[in-house]
């Protein structure tokens, strides 16, 4: 993506360096618009425009993200881990918020880019699947004593495991793809 005035205005709202040299689409996600920012020092960040069709409560979403990532940082530090690699790190705006709202009402957020990290869209083998489960279990363990009552429900029933499992079973029974 060309570093146009819009991108410069958006990035200038965050506590970032001044010498943005590149802004390119990043990843294969299909919900948010995601870009990798490169600065003159070689440092990278992730810039995301949140999809308001999916995330209709972006302020509440970002309160959740801020709370959970702060909690994870504390737990990771207590365990002697690397907080810049083991959890997302939000970059705040100059106003101290974890998001910026542009003149069109679009919500943007910035994270530190985790160098040399790997993200899989699909598992290649059983080991990948196993390691994903290990990572998810570790994530759950770190959040075991998180005050869940502080979280906002930003997508109805999204984290309701019972509801999701019921919907999955119904989809399997219907087998509309004839698998």
Please report, for each region that a protein language model flagged, where it lies by residue.
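Juxta-kinase regulatory segment immediately upstream of eukaryotic protein kinase catalytic domains
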Residues: 1-24, 68, 72
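Conserved ATP-binding subdomain of kinase catalytic cores across diverse folds
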Residues: 22-177
